[in-house]
Design a protein with these regions (language model features):
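Alpha-helical segment of the N-proximal tetratricopeptide repeat
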Residues: 41-70, 127, 131-142, 405, ...
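Generic helix N-cap/helix-start motif at coil->alpha-helix transitions
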Residues: 44-48, 203-209, 237-245, 276-285, ...
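"A position-specific structural signal for the A-helix of alpha-solenoid helical repeats
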Residues: 50, 84, 127-132, 169, ...
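Residue at a conserved register position within TPR or TPR-like alpha-solenoid repeats
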Residues: 55, 89, 132, 174, ...
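Solenoid-like repeat scaffolds
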Residues: 73-74, 157-159, 199-201, 230-238, ...
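TPR/TPR-like (Sel1-like) alpha-helical repeat modules
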Residues: 79, 86, 90, 98-118, ...
Length: 527
């Protein structure tokens, strides 16, 4: 792939290519895909501006900001660079937005762009559209600001119907403002329709492939994202995020080996970018996939590597807590889960809950339900804090984990009906929403845990139904396959037992020593 960032410039201005600049500096050009963003900046600013747009589309925010500021340095009248700076300072639109300091810097850029006065109405409209995100910044949460940004860019795209970049950014913000409880995925589907047309027109555009993956990052429509997932890493192979993003779709459809491979490449690229946050995020997806294949040795190595990393961002704080937690619970090592150390301090309390949840469930399932009470109380306190902060999404996610942990305490105490009621409530609540984009999946799906509890209660048919329902949202999970196989055996359903044991053996690597795989092979050999 080459970086061919061809721009159709307003006022007939033509800038030098990135390849030329790279050759002059003696460095290889970055392979970031092909984009086209008409602008009226001076020729000497074109290359930096186009590089900034390319990095922006692959969420290379540090590099993008540097490039846009360089465009300003080369042409102090390049007002559209203000739009670029304000846009990259939002950061990942699927996360939590900039700090107040970042917002202040963005507002300064917007004010500069307004003062300069862009040479075209279109450029002035871009600056005003991004300003919609920062209006009344301190008074609104990120979600409300993203909705305003989406509305502004939807109007911009409608007004400039022939502007591909306006259509592409409008689609991104449509998906970013998709409600996690809207199971019709209306905004994401609308975005996908825009992007599919762009994909046919601009197949090497990094943002098109990238945002298609986000638009299809939901269980019911994930397979539609496979073409973009298989293309994106090749479009922008020098961007760590572009190498990671295909695993969002691979995880949704259970392509575990593909997820491991693309995240391994992403980790190498992220280290080269000195981006520990991206390293941790890719590691979380990688360890999740390793554990579905029962590659426990590989997963353990990732756990150890993750312990040496830290980053203040949400995705990395989440990953830093999730990785060792997943390693314990995916292997049903409940005593190990009960002994998990707390994650590093984070400004995001909902990243702490994974460890609390795993410790509580681990203690309850390893014979020490009293030892789980403190962690459940802490989960309840975090729910109160999040509700007070009007962080409804994460308050609900934490409440699911509180209910699940409380269910296993009740179950260990012999209160089976109470336990099953709590566990069903957790599963229903979780199913009503979607996982966050910061995560490959919840620590353990609540409906999968309901299957565990039903199976241990001697209700094999109900357990089988729970596991199969869990597999709809979280396909090809090894624990769900094993649970479904055991439930089928207990229910006397030999055909389904054989099917699920076969799926386990076919999916997991042959050299795994997990006892559940040994049992699967023994069952298949005996029948």
């Amino acid at each position: 792939m080459r970086i061919a960032l061809v721009f159709y410039l307003l006022l007939g201005l033509l800038g030098a290519t990135s390849v030329a600049r790279a050759n002059e500096d003696g460095a290889a050009p970055k392979k970031l895909g092909e984009v086209a963003f008409a602008n009226s900046c001076a020729p000497e600013a074109q290359e930096s501006f186009e590089l900034g747009v390319a990095w922006l589309h692959s969420f290379g925010f540090v590099e993008g900001e540097q490039a846009f500021r360089d465009a300003f340095n080369r042409d102090p009248n390049c007002a559209i660079a203000a739009w670029g700076i304000a846009t990259v300072l939002i950061g990942n639109t699927f996360s939590i937005g900039p700090s107040p300091e970042g917002a202040q810097q963005a507002q300064q850029a917007i004010d500069r762009g307004r003062t300069l006065g862009a040479k075209s109405q279109r450029e002035r409209d871009y600056i005003e559209a991004i300003a919609a995100y920062y209006d009344h910044f301190a008074e609104r949460p990120h979600g409300a600001r993203i909705r305003s940004l989406s509305d502004a860019f939807e109007a911009l795209a409608k007004h400039y119907g022939d502007d591909d970049e306006a259509q592409i950014f409008s689609a991104l913000y449509l998906t970013a403002s998709q409600s996690p409880t809207d199971k019709s995925y209306s905004r994401a589907r609308k975005a996908a329709a825009i992007l599919e047309a762009q994909f046919a027109k601009n197949p090497n555009h990094p943002g098109v492939a990238h945002y298609l993956i986000h638009s299809y990052d939901y269980p019911a429509i994930a397979r539609n994202g496979l073409p973009a997932a298989f293309c994106y890493a090749g479009i922008a192979p020098d961007a760590a995020h572009a190498l990671h993003m295909p695993s969002h779709i691979f995880t949704r459809v259970g392509l575990w080996r593909e997820s491991i491979e693309t995240n391994a490449r992403s980790i190498v690229a992220a280290r080269a970018e000195n981006n520990s946050g991206s390293v941790l995020h890719a590691m979380d997806y990688m360890v999740y996939a390793d554990l579905q294949l029962a590659r426990d040795t590989d997963a353990a190595a990732v756990v150890q590597q993750s312990l040496d990393l830290s980053d203040p961002g949400l995705a990395s704080a989440y990953a830093r807590a999730a990785i060792p937690t997943r390693y314990a619970v995916e292997r049903d090592q409940w005593s190990e889960a009960a002994a998990l150390a707390g994650p590093p301090a984070s400004k995001f309390p909902y990243t702490e809950v994974m460890t609390l949840f795993a410790r509580a469930v681990g203690a309850a399932r390893s014979g020490n339900p009293a030892g789980a009470e403190k962690d459940v109380a802490r989960l309840a306190a975090i729910v109160v804090v999040l509700k007070g902060a009007k962080n409804d999404y994460w308050a609900t996610e934490v409440e699911v984990q509180r209910l699940g942990a409380a269910a296993w305490i009740a179950f260990a105490g012999g209160n089976r009906e109470e336990a099953l009621g709590l566990m069903r409530s957790a599963a229903d609540m979780e199913d009503a929403s979607e996982k966050s984009a910061v995560s490959p999946g919840r620590v353990l799906p609540a409906r999968e845990l309901l299957g565990d509890m039903l199976l241990e209660s001697g209700r094999a048919d109900d357990a089988l139904a729970a596991y199969e329902a869990s597999l709809v949202n979280d396909p090809k999970r090894l624990r769900s396959f094993y649970g479904a196989a055991r439930a089928a055996v207990a229910a006397g359903n030999r055909d389904k037992a054989r099917d699920y044991f076969s799926l386990m053996v076919e999916m997991a690597d042959g050299n795994s020593t997990r006892p559940e795989l040994t049992k699967a092979r023994q069952y298949l050999a005996a029948k």
